[in-house]
Amino acid sequence: MATQRASGLLQRLAQGSLVKQILVGLILGILLAWISKPAAEAVGLLGTLFVGALKAVAPVLVLMLVMASIANHQHGQKTNIRPILFLYLLGTFSAALAAVVFSFAFPSTLHLSSSAQDIVPPSGIVEVLRGLLMSMVSNPIDALLNANYIGILVWAVGLGFALRHGNETTKNLVNDMSNAVTFMVKLVIRFAPVGIFGLVSSTLATTGFSTLWGYAHLLVVLIGCMLLVALVVNPLLVFWKIRRNPYPLVFACLRESGVYAFFTRSSAANIPVNMALCEKLNLDRDTYSVSIPLGATINMAGAAITITVLTLAAVHTLGVPVDLPTALLLSVVASLCACGASGVAGGSLLLIPLACNMFGIPNDIAMQVVAVGFIIGVLQDSCETALNSSTDVLFTAAACQAEDERLANNALRS
């Protein structure tokens, strides 16, 4: 009887809401740090183990995921979605640019276990570009061992294109390996509540409760930037496309897509909701049936904001100087990282080390930034997904309505 109860409890823990479990871990960590400082410092080992597991699995995940995605790409699918694709890419880059501006206007700092003396900052854009180029030609084994994500991406893309010409058995093997690594990542993510409990407890025990304000400030910057993109940047892009008041369409998408995505925290799970909204808006079925799933994969404005804000928070914490060209390059890198965020369990957070590489920030410190992201992830991930998913249907509707008006005007002229 006791065994059955124990197995039932474990099953509920394994299948329960990760968001609620992280929230419980966060609260318990705060309480433990408040009640007993020595005990809170002791359970810091749980957080260290969690961050170590993330560090171990992330490089392999990026390699296998990108390689499998390119190798298994299907040829011959012809759709007229260029304007939507352009809006997706422009919107993601605009979000990253807005995040850079927001981060410099309201700089955030984090509590990291390394000082600025550990960092050798790049002197400017030329050195950053040189470092990126040298990272690209790194040995693949060396890139995996040292978590050189630029080198990993180059090898993953190259091998992916090479394997496109391989037989189906090879492609299936690569796909199965990708699924296996993804399973391992999901397994690690299931321990996030325990890791967060350890991280919060030890952090508060060693730095004090003032750390919470630092995270609150970071969260305000993140969510504030996402609101800026949702209510100012995206409406400007939609107005540029349809040449009329964009806000009725913007609010409809936020209300009927964003709210669902906020609670599901999954762009993929929100695809049926977006499809139904597109049908309600009388959009072209052949267009939205392709653009909505595509948007769930590459339209990642929220992820671009998360990557940019957290990377610059680490940069500000470590005192690394950033010039304007480097900040612009970060916007481009964050946009490219964001386009790959959909396939990563844990979302955009595990792609932060890739952006941190630009500034000479070691993988150890970058993974501490990822851990901070998990601490604030209860709200951050929900807001990020709401922005990502609602923007999918918003840009699809804008492009379709603009095309309908163009065809109507041409018909009147003729």
Curated annotation (Swiss-Prot):
A Pfam family of this chain: SDF
Protein name (record): Serine/threonine transporter SstT
PANTHER family recorded: PROTON/GLUTAMATE-ASPARTATE SYMPORTER (PTHR42865), SERINE_THREONINE TRANSPORTER SSTT (PTHR42865:SF8)
Highest taxon listed in the record's lineage: Bacteria
Annotated transmembrane regions: 16-36, 46-66, 84-104, 143-163, 180-200, 219-239, 300-320, 332-352
Alphabetized HAMAP family for the sequence: Ser_Thr_transp_SstT
Function of the molecule: Involved in the import of serine and threonine into the cell, with the concomitant import of sodium (symport system).
InterPro entries tied to this protein: Na-dicarboxylate_symporter, Na:dicarbo_symporter_sf, Ser_Thr_transp_SstT
Keywords: Amino-acid transport, Cell inner membrane, Cell membrane, Membrane, Symport, Transmembrane, Transmembrane helix, Transport
Annotated localization: Cell inner membrane
Predominant location: membrane
SUPFAM superfamilies named among the record's database cross-references: Proton glutamate symport protein (SSF118215)
